[in-house]
């Protein structure tokens, strides 16, 4: 593992010396759902030691909706993620807290489960994993002191930001208490996203990567509660204004896909700088490799982790 990390560090130094920035990171999510998935996920995490990635992000749902949201399971997942050989960042999904009120999940209070996630997975200003990544957390702001899960960091001229946007309609439309939670959390998310875009607009920076759990339903949710409409509009507005490569990486749908779903509101043209990447999900256990290369006009290259060789 040390040799692999040293090789990655040398590669980053070499690219910096040549005037380019080149590195890779890993993303996966929506797994492990059940106990029988755990060995495959452990193997996936362990394999990252030799994959030459700078860090890994799990975009939510570390259990199935029908699995109890117990403290014990949360602690098992924390240990699993903390054993990662590379820095590990976790973004919460709906199965991890908003859906914990369901009978099979244990009839927990979702707000209590989110508090437990914050206690276990975001105890300080570093990532999980045996190698640590220093993070800026939104909770540093007194106004948003609860939102430790929202993190930001900069690497190789790219701003990375995480948002707590789970599936299951983003915790909207179930009852008044959850609707209040939704409104407060989305206010925090929009503030944090605005700050990340402002940071990415700096002359010395090249692009922005946003991580969240939910598929924001770019095609709309006609006739159903829509907890993502304002997020879709915010992404559209920011992508058009930033005019730099921007990725949204999410889970929730359990299907690997890459597309460019946003169009300019004024003329209907595709926003070519914005790309959505959705990761694999249970029952499939795999990860997505994203390569960053400042010499690439599109900046980002995306491929399947188990089949994509490490960059030279």
PLM features: what roles do these ranges have?
Residues 30, 60-61, 93-94, 213, ...:
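Active-site glycine-centered loops adjacent to acidic/histidine catalytic or metal-binding residues
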Residues 288-312:
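A short C-terminal boundary segment appended to hydrolase-like catalytic domains
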Residues 6-15:
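Bacterial N-terminal signal peptides
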Residues 18-73, 205:
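N-terminal active-site segment of His-dependent metallophosphoesterases
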Residues 21, 37-44, 59, 70-77, ...:
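Stable alpha-helical elements in mature extracytoplasmic
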Residues 48-55, 161, 176-262:
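His/acidic metal-ligating clusters that form di-metal
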Residues 1-4:
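Positively charged n-region of N-terminal signal peptides that target proteins for export
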Residues 68, 73-185, 260-293:
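Extended active-site neighborhood of metal-dependent phosphoesterases/phosphodiesterases
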